[in-house]
Every structure is written in structure tokens, then in C-alpha cells.
Amino acid sequence: NERAMSKVIEDKQREAGDGHDGTWVAHPALVPIATAVFDRLMPTPNNLHRLREDVQVKASDLLEVPAGTITAEGLANNVSVSLQYLAAWLSGNGCVPINNLMEDAATAEIARAQIWQWIRHPRGVLADGRRVTLALFRELLATEQRRLSAAMGAAAYRGGHFEAAAALLDEITAAREFQSFLTLAAYRQLN
């Protein structure tokens, strides 16, 4: 948790330094931390005086598909984050430290949306040349389940809603139509 808090402080310092007027936090307990950073780095009510003339953005830039590659590590990380977040959410926690970062539903949404999209998009190819497929996703999901079970112990794994989370993640990833929001599907697990 200490490393996660350090990362929160670092992120808020970057945001205030970039000229943001405010920020969001994943949990109400983080409000005092973010407030302290912004009070120190932004002593005025806003940053309207801080122009970013070093950044030139055109309308066409907003529609451009980003360049880059999909890495095996990135795909595996998306599977891990999605699984861990869903398991935590099903356990009643909406803000979770994962990989030393405080994560919430938005992070899991991005991760699972990328997985779903990469499986279906013609450019869904890993840097090593492999296609991102449902079978590859399922292989990575099973690997992550084994890794988590070994790391935390079988009893903790079983008690942590990981099996239900894995089944749900598989269901929404395999769905023909993109599911609007992962927690909507997760609510069915609670009833």
C-alpha cells in the first residue's frame, strides 16, 4: 500500500505540474493526499494562467488511431488486472491496489475492453506476430489463475471470488457484442 500511495502522490504532482485544475481519486481516503499536492503546487484557484503553448493539437489529432504495438506482457497484464479487479469487486472492494497502483473499475474497463477489441480487430496482433485470439486469452487467464492461487494459497484464492471473476471475464470477453459495463454483468453474480 505504501508504494501505491507514493504512486498516487507522483501522479497528482504530474497532474498539477501539467496545469490541471483538479483531479480524481479512486477512493475518498485519497482526497487529503491529492488536496495537499494541489494546494502546494497550485496556490491559485485555477491554472487558467498556465498556458501550454508547448502543445499543439489539431482536430485531426483527436481522431488518429494511436501508433504502437500490442505486447504479450501488455495482454497478460490486462488479463491480470481484469481478473484481480473483478474478484475484488465481487468481494465488496471497488478500489484495489494492483501492481502497486490504486485501481478502480475504470482501469478494469480499459483492460477488458482492449482484450475484447484486440481479439476482434484486424490489427489485434502481438509484437511477436501471434494473433490475439479467444484461445490465447483463455490460456493467459488460466495461467494467471494458477499464478494467483500459488501466490496467495489455495484457500485464500478460493475465498477471493477468483473462480467467479474468471468465469465472468471469460463470458464478457467471448460475447459477440461488447458488454456496456463490466460491473453490470458482475451484479448478476451478487444476486
Q: For each predicted feature, which ranges?
A:
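Expand to "…catalyze enediolate/carbanion chemistry for C-C bond making/breaking, isomerization
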Residues: 1-191
